[in-house]
Design a protein with these regions (language model features):
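Active-site proximal loops enriched in glycine and acidic residues that flank catalytic Cys/His/Asp
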Residues: 131, 146-150, 159-164, 174, ...
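Alpha-helical bilayer-embedded segments of polytopic membrane proteins, i.e.
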Residues: 22-26, 72-86, 109-160
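Membrane-embedded catalytic scaffold of the fatty acid hydroxylase/desaturase
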Residues: 1-110, 177-221
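Membrane-interfacial segments
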Residues: 2, 6, 96-99, 136, ...
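Active/binding-pocket-proximal capping segment
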Residues: 149-154, 161-187
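Hydrophobic positions within alpha-helical membrane elements
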Residues: 5-9, 127, 155, 170
Length: 221
């Protein structure tokens, strides 16, 4: 909510609370660019929306090249989802940082402050999530606890966002990589490329903070 600018009416409060994403291993600056600007504008547009980025291991829409391994992706995809949050923290953010791009879109220039926040939070992540726990409880206990945390987080994030966009009833639209022109106006595009799920399940709604109402979220983020 803070990274969406909706936690508080005060920008500085949202900025501070948004840093809790850094505490989980992500980076608020890169995520806001990747999610708020790109994903919320070019939802399900192959080559632009990083949430459906093409991969040799996972094919998420018909415009992505089919590979023989994809016939088994329904089997091996769960372990990939399970490590996705850890990959986000230690790999994917760095790829975007050093390439200066999110898919085909040039990443907004980071200020000196944002560069300091990026590196300091990544270092603190390693210290508080790996170094300190291994030192105080031993590597075996750490490995079990850390793995359980990452599996739960990775599966939760993947399931929520895949059910909201990568399902049969959503469209996967095409846009020019350079001009980024989509067929429909923004609101129609959001409705066509997004899906609600478990809308009548109060437990799910509570657990995911209302993100199962994904159409509403995209129209009124």
């Amino acid at each position: 909510d803070a990274c969406h600018g909706s936690y508080s009416s005060k920008k500085w409060v949202n900025e501070i609370m948004g840093l809790t994403l850094n505490a989980l291993g992500g980076n608020a600056f890169i995520w806001k660019f990747k999610h708020n600007i790109i994903h919320h504008t070019y939802t399900n547009v192959d080559g632009i929306d990083d949430d459906i980025a093409k991969s040799p291991l996972m094919r998420q829409c018909s415009t992505q090249k089919w590979m023989p391994a994809h016939r088994l992706q329904h089997i091996y995809i769960l372990p990939i989802y399970a490590i996705s949050s850890f990959a986000w923290a230690v790999l994917l953010d760095f790829i975007k940082y050093f390439k200066g791009k999110v898919q085909a879109t040039v990443l907004q220039k980071m200020s000196v402050k944002e560069n300091i926040v990026f590196w300091s939070s990544k270092i603190l992540y390693l210290i508080f999530y790996i170094v300190f726990p291994v030192y105080f409880v031993g590597w075996q206990s750490w490995a079990i606890g850390f793995s359980c945390m990452q599996v739960v987080l990775g599966l939760t994030l993947a399931i929520v966002f895949q059910l909201a966009h990568v399902v049969e009833q959503t469209d996967f639209e095409v846009a020019g990589i350079e001009d980024k022109l989509i067929d429909n106006e923004w609101a129609i595009h959001q409705i066509k490329t997004t899906a609600d799920f478990a809308a009548k399940n109060k437990v799910i709604s509570w657990l995911v903070g209302g993100l199962n109402f994904q159409i509403e979220h995209h129209l009124f983020p």
